[in-house]
Design a protein with these regions (language model features):
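Conserved RecA-like P-loop NTPase helicase motor core
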Residues: 578-665
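Conserved P-loop NTPase catalytic core
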Residues: 194-204, 282-288, 298-458, 463-474, ...
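C-terminal helicase lobe and adjacent C-terminal extensions/tails of nucleic-acid helicase motors
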Residues: 388-528, 532-536, 543-549, 645, ...
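Conserved RecA-like ASCE ATPase "motif II neighborhood" in helicase/translocase motors
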Residues: 217-282, 296-313, 611
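Conserved pre-motif I regulatory segment
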Residues: 101-137
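Conserved C-terminal RecA-like helicase domain
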Residues: 192-222, 270, 277-291, 434, ...
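Hydrophobic positions on the alpha1 helix immediately C-terminal to the Walker A/P-loop
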Residues: 149, 153
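Conserved Walker A/P-loop ATP-binding site and its immediately adjacent core
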Residues: 164-188, 192-194, 200-203, 493
Length: 730
C-alpha cells in the first residue's frame, strides 16, 4: 500500500469531486477513484482501500434534529447569507477545516450547516432588532460532538453580526482550557497562548491555516490560568465596539462572572434609569456548555450564585441570546417555566463590590429546545451496553439482564470487574469490617478520605494496564504512531486516594516496562494470551461494521505487535488529574495536566487517574481503556462519567471498559430511560408542542438510582405505569 500521505491526498481529491455533484452514489464514487488513479497511478490495493474508505465516509449519516418551538419561526438567515458572498467567511473556513483536517463525513457537515442555520433563525438578526432576549437549549449525546456543534454556531453568529460571544465552559480549569483550544482551532485560527507571549513562531492553527484573513479576538487563552482577568483584558486593548467579533471562554465561577460583568459594565455600559447600566448595540451570544451543571438554580427561596450571575450578565445587554448545550437534560426538564420563576425571584439583584445588577429571568429555554440525533458512527450506551427497545417500557429486570433480544450492533466492549466487591456485599458485619481493616477491598464504595489505602493494584486493573499497552502497540502497527492514547482510571473522588493509586500504577508500569525491555517470557506469554483470546476475536467481529470505521481496523498479528511493545510502553506517562497544587500528604507529585496540545506533534500516551475533573465535559483523546468503579446514584452523573462514549475511528476494536456488573446494569437502565425520554420528545415534536410543555416523563429506578440531584428536582411529579404503558393511580 502507498504512503499514508498519498492516500490522504487521494481521498481529499475524491471527496472534492464528489462534493461538486452530490449525492455520492456508488457509481460516482467509482468514477472519482478512476479519475484520481489516472493522476496518482495507484496500485490495485490502494484503489480497493480508497473505494472502501469513500463508501464508509459517505455512508455516515445523521438524522434531522427535532425542534420544539414557542412561536412560528420567520427565517432570516438564508436571506442574510444571500446578500453577500463574504457573509459566511467564518463558517466556510470552519466547514473546510472539519472536512479536510478532521475528516468529518460530508453528510454530518451538511447536517451541522443546516442545524446552525436553524438555531440562528430562532435567535435574532442582530442587525434588524434594537432589543431582544432569546433562550434555547440543544440536547445532544455524551461525547457526540457538542463542542464542534457550538463552535459551528459561533462561526455563524459571528458571520451574522454577533459581536461578543461568551462561552461558559464547565467548572474546572482543565475543561475551560480544552474548550478554549477548540475555539482557537475552529473559530479564532490562532494559538491564544503564543499570541500573548509575542512569540516569533507562526501561531496559526486550525482554521487560521485555511484562511488567515478572517479576524476575531479573544480576551482569554487556552493556558490553564488563561481564564478572564481584568488586567489581561485591559492589556489586550481590544475595541469591543469594533468590527471584529470578540470571544471570551470562562469557567462557571461566581467571582469570574462578577468580574466580567463589572468590567463590561464599566467598559461599554451606559447609564440606564437611576441605578442601572445597559450595554447597547453589542449583540451578545452566550453559550452555556454542560447547561445542567452549575447553571441550574438550586435554591428554592433565593437565587444560586452562578445562576444569578449568568442571568445578570444576560440582563446587562439590550441584545442577548442564550443557548445551553447538554447531553443530560434531566435537571433542565425540571426548571420552572418563566411565569412561575418570575414570581419566585422577583426584584433580586446581584451585588458586585459597591455595585449591584438586576437579575433577569431564569434560564428556561422558552424559544426552542432541539434534540440532535448522533451520527451513525457514534458509539453510545445503547451500542456499548445494549438496550432492548428504546420506544417501549419494560419490566426492569428483563431489560437489564436479558441480552438475548439484543441486535448485532451491540459491541460488548466491557469486561466485568470480579475482584471488586463493595463492603455492603457482605451480609456479616464482622466479615465486612475484617475486609476493611485488612485492606482486602480495593476501593470500597463508601470509603472515606482517611481510610486505609490499598497496598497493591487488583488483578483486574493490572490486566487493564496490559490491555492499554497492547492497544498502544496495535495502533502503532496500524500506522497510528504520532497520535494520543489515553487510559482512564476513575475509582475515587478523594485527591489523596487518586495520588496513591497513581503511585501504585507508576510502580507497576515500571515493572511492565522492564519486563518488555528484557523480554520476560512469562510476561510476553501473558500479553500474547490476552491478545489472542480477547483482541483478535473482537477485531474480527467489529471490522465488518462499516458504520463505525471497521474498514480501518486491520487485523494485527502477534509478530508485528511484539515489535511495537517497547516503543509503546516507553511513551506511556501517568497523570494524577485533579488540579490541586498542594503536595502535602500526597504520595505522587506528578500532578501535571493532561497536556495533549503540548504533545500534539508526537502524541501523548497517558494513564489519567482522577475523579471529578474526569467526570464531565473533558475529552480524553484517543481513549481506549477505561477502568471505572466510581459509584453514583444519579442518572446525569453516571452518564457524564461515561468518557468512553463517542467516536473511535480505526481503533474501536481496541477499546475496553472494566467496570462492576452493578454499574453495567445501571448504565443499561439509564440507556433505556434516556431513549424513552428522547422518544417522548419526538412525540411532542409530532404534536407541535412548545418548550413550556417540556415536562417529560423520565423512568425512575426506585430505590437504587435517582434522576438528578434533589435540589434540581423540586418541580416533579411521580407517576406509576403498568405493563400496558398506561398511567395507574397510586
Amino acid at each position: 500500500m502507498s504512503d499514508k500521505s498519498i492516500l490522504e491526498q487521494a481521498l481529499k481529491i475524491c471527496r472534492n469531486l464528489l462534493d461538486i455533484d452530490p449525492p455520492a452514489t456508488i457509481n460516482k464514487i467509482k468514477d472519482s477513484v478512476d479519475k484520481v488513479n489516472r493522476i496518482l497511478q495507484l496500485s490495485d490495493e490502494d484503489n480497493s482501500y480508497l473505494l472502501s474508505r469513500l463508501i464508509e465516509v459517505t455512508g455516515t449519516d445523521q438524522d434531522e434534529p427535532r425542534i420544539l418551538d414557542n412561536d412560528t419561526i420567520i427565517p432570516w438567515v438564508i436571506d442574510k447569507w444571500s446578500e453577500n458572498a463574504d457573509n459566511r467567511r467564518f463558517w466556510k473556513r470552519y466547514r473546510d477545516y472539519l472536512a479536510d483536517e478532521k475528516k468529518i463525513a460530508p453528510k454530518v457537515i451538511s447536517r451541522l450547516d443546516e442545524l446552525t442555520d436553524k438555531i440562528l433563525d430562532r435567535l435574532a438578526d442582530p442587525d434588524a432588532h434594537d432589543q431582544f432576549d432569546k433562550r434555547g437549549l440543544v440536547v445532544g449525546h455524551v461525547q457526540s460532538g457538542k463542542t464542534s456543534n457550538y463552535v459551528g454556531l459561533i462561526t455563524k453568529a459571528a458571520d451574522a453580526g454577533y459581536k461578543l460571544i461568551v462561552v461558559l465552559a464547565g467548572i474546572h480549569s482543565t475543561l475551560r482550557s480544552q474548550t478554549q483550544l477548540r475555539v482557537d482551532e475552529g473559530f479564532l485560527g490562532y494559538d491564544t497562548v503564543t499570541s500573548r507571549s509575542f512569540s516569533e513562531n507562526n501561531n496559526l492553527i486550525g482554521v487560521g491555516r485555511i484562511d488567515p484573513g478572517v479576524q476575531a479576538h479573544s480576551l482569554t487563552s487556552s493556558a490553564l490560568n488563561g481564564d478572564f482577568k481584568r488586567s489581561v483584558a485591559e492589556a489586550v486593548n481590544v475595541n469591543l465596539r469594533g468590527t471584529d467579533p470578540v470571544v471570551i471562554v470562562i469557567k462557571k465561577n461566581t467571582s469570574i462572572l462578577k468580574n466580567l460583568i463589572n468590567w463590561l459594565s464599566g467598559k461599554i455600559g451606559e447609564n440606564y434609569g437611576e441605578n442601572e447600566r445597559i450595554i447597547n448595540n453589542i449583540p451578545l451570544l452566550l453559550i452555556d456548555d454542560e447547561a445542567d451543571n452549575a447553571s441550574i438554580n438550586i435554591s428554592k427561596s433565593s437565587v444560586s450564585s452562578i445562576n444569578g450571575a449568568i442571568r445578570a450578565l444576560l440582563r446587562l445587554f439590550r441584545k442577548s441570546a442564550y443557548v445551553g448545550y447538554t447531553a443530560t437534560p434531566y435537571a433542565n426538564v425540571f426548571i420552572p417555566p418563566p411565569e412561575k420563576a418570575k414570581e419566585l425571584h422577583k426584584g433580586i439583584r446581584l451585588v458586585v463590590g459597591n455595585k449591584d445588577y438586576p437579575v433577569g429571568e431564569d434560564l428556561f429555554p422558552r424559544e426552542f429546545i432541539i434534540n440532535i440525533p448522533p451520527p451513525s458512527n457514534y458509539i453510545g450506551p445503547e451500542k456499548f451496553f445494549g438496550i432492548v427497545d428504546e420506544n417501549a417500557i419494560y419490566d426492569q429486570q428483563e431489560t437489564l439482564e436479558d441480552d438475548s433480544r439484543s441486535d448485532n450492533s451491540i459491541m460488548h466492549l466491557y469486561e466485568p470487574v470480579k475482584d471488586y466487591q463493595p463492603v455492603e456485599y457482605f451480609d456479616n458485619k464482622d466479615i465486612a469490617e475484617t475486609v476493611r481493616e485488612n485492606n482486602l477491598n480495593f476501593i470500597p464504595d463508601k470509603h472515606q478520605k482517611d481510610d486505609a489505602k490499598p497496598r497493591e493494584l487488583p488483578e483486574s486493573l493490572r490486566k487493564a494496564m496490559k490491555c492499554f499497552i497492547l492497544a498502544c502497540a496495535a495502533r502503532r502497527v496500524r500506522g497510528q504512531i504520532n497520535v494520543h492514547n489515553s487510559m482512564l482510571v476513575h475509582v475515587t473522588r478523594f485527591i489523596t486516594w487518586q495520588n496513591h493509586i497513581a503511585l501504585l500504577i507508576i510502580d507497576e508500569l515500571d515493572r511492565y516496562r522492564n519486563r518488555i525491555e528484557f523480554g520476560s517470557p512469562d510476561f510476553l506469554d501473558d500479553l500474547k494470551m490476552i491478545w489472542d483470546q480477547d483482541f483478535i476475536p473482537k477485531t474480527e467481529e467489529i471490522s465488518v461494521l462499516k458504520d463505525v470505521g471497521g474498514l480501518d481496523m486491520t487485523p494485527v498479528s502477534w509478530e508485528k505487535l511484539k515489535l511495537e511493545l517497547f516503543p509503546a510502553v516507553t511513551k506511556i506517562r501517568v497523570r494524577a488529574v485533579h488540579g490541586s497544587t498542594m503536595l502535602g500528604g500526597l504520595d505522587a507529585e506528578n500532578i501535571q495536566p493532561v497536556d495533549y496540545y503540548e504533545n500534539r506533534k508526537k502524541g501523548l500516551s497517558v494513564i489519567a487517574v482522577g475523579g471529578n475533573k474526569l467526570s464531565r465535559g473533558l475529552t480524553l483523546e484517543g481513549l481506549t481503556i477505561s477502568y471505572f468503579l466510581r459509584a453514583s446514584k444519579m442518572y446525569d452523573t453516571l452518564m457524564q462519567m461515561g468518557r468512553w462514549f463517542g467516536y473511535r475511528p480505526g481503533y474501536l476494536d481496541l477499546c475496553r471498559l472494566f467496570t462492576s456488573s452493578d454499574l453495567v446494569s445501571h448504565y443499561k437502565h439509564i440507556a433505556v430511560a434516556t431513549e424513552e425520554m428522547r422518544a417522548e420528545f419526538d412525540r411532542m415534536w409530532l404534536l407541535r408542542r412548545k418548550p413550556i410543555d417540556y415536562g417529560l416523563k423520565i423512568r425512575a429506578h426506585t430505590g437504587i438510582l435517582t434522576i438528578t440531584a434533589a435540589n434540581k428536582f423540586r418541580y416533579k411529579k411521580m407517576m406509576s405505569f403498568g405493563f400496558s404503558g398506561e398511567l395507574e393511580e397510586t
